[in-house]
Amino acid sequence: MSALTIPAARRTLNNAPIIDAANGKTPTRTPVWFMRQAGRSLPEYKKVREGISMLDSCFMPELLAEITLQPVRRHDVDAAILFSDIVVPLRAAGVGVEIVAGRGPVLDAPVRSREDVLNLPILEGNVPEVEQGIGIILDELSDSQALIGFAGAPFTLASYLVEGGPSKNHEKTKAMMHGDPETWHALMARLVPTIVNSLKSQIDAGIDAMQLFDSWAGFLTERDYTEFVLPYSTEILEEVGKYQLPRIHFGVGTGELLGAMSKAGSEVMGVDWRVPLDKAAERIAAVSGPKVLQGNLDPALLFAGRAPLTKEIERIKAEAQTAIDAGHATGHIFNLGHGVLPNTVAEDITEAVSIIHS
């Protein structure tokens, strides 16, 4: 894989709380952004997406920029997260995939054999539609508002490819891992350049940070994660690390994997709501030393009302500070422990951001 270079045109941020926290500096306020902050919780999102498929919208520069910016305008979050989907790199590479309403990504042809792996297209270059959208986004963001890019981690993409779509148990995926490990490792290795080139495209266009998102890693044992997944996520984060921008690593239900995942090399570790932040920090620091924490409000608590919401936010902030004071963490970025739920009231998200910033 060719060496990556730092884009000469990358903008200079000034007092950007997300980036300061990610770099272990003291931010001007508690930084916050929410996974899936751009989406169905916003009426303006539903309006602009009407009649346009999810994947198509990810390849329309003006539309993806508008959707990315909507929550920044409305909620005063400290970062925009690029509106996209984890299967966008697959579609850009030429893989037949659609996002089916009510189900999720569905592949035209599952990958089940060594021949299937060898025939899987690789994303060789940049994604111009996404780069154009990023340019539009950066024109509106202030120099204190970060733009976070992202990509799906190789295990999650591999699971979609092997299962042919979403799976409750990932039985075909695990069967390939253990029953045909040679094919499994070949598939993971083949996904690496597609993911790296997707992130490279975003970085070339000017993103300020990135997140590697492993939706399904929580279904794995630590042993399986370490043997079958970690080497490939590590390779991706190492390649992106040459760009010298903050890297966030997050997986759902990964409390028992935090130590193993931290070995992949990100500066920031995302934590879901099932693990107290100070305990998560201990698990991470014991393996990889202190890192910046991201998280970890239960998305359902956005429905609870101001008083209980405030109590939970204060608890999470206190846990983060406990971890920092103990030398187990170097900073904290507030986020949910997963994505914003589609039926969340937009005004409740705005209120949560205000409480976090206060």
Swiss-Prot record:
Listed InterPro entries: UROD/MetE-like_sf, Uroporphyrinogen_deCO2ase_HemE, Uroporphyrinogen_deCOase
Q: Name one GO cellular component term.
A: cytosol
Question: Upper lineage ranks?
Answer: Bacteria, Bacillati, Actinomycetota, Actinomycetes, Mycobacteriales
- Does the entry feature the keyword Lyase, yes or no? yes
Q: Which residues bind substrate?
A: 36-40, 85, 160, 215, 338
State the UniProt keywords alphabetically. Answer: Cytoplasm, Decarboxylase, Lyase, Porphyrin biosynthesis
Q: Name one GO molecular function term.
A: uroporphyrinogen decarboxylase activity
This protein's record includes keyword Nucleotide-binding: no
Question: What GO biological process terms does the UniProt entry carry, in alphabetical order?
Answer: protoporphyrinogen IX biosynthetic process
Name the site position(s) for Transition state stabilizer: 85
Q: In which pathway does it act?
A: Porphyrin-containing compound metabolism; protoporphyrin-IX biosynthesis; coproporphyrinogen-III from 5-aminolevulinate: step 4/4
Function, in words: Catalyzes the decarboxylation of four acetate groups of uroporphyrinogen-III to yield coproporphyrinogen-III.
Q: Which domain of life is it from?
A: Bacteria
Outline the subunit composition.
Homodimer.
Q: What is its EC number?
A: 4.1.1.37
Quickly give the catalysed reaction.
uroporphyrinogen III + 4 H(+) = coproporphyrinogen III + 4 CO2
The family classification in the record reads: Belongs to the uroporphyrinogen decarboxylase family.
Tell me what this protein is called. Answer: Uroporphyrinogen decarboxylase
Q: Where in the cell does this protein reside?
A: Cytoplasm
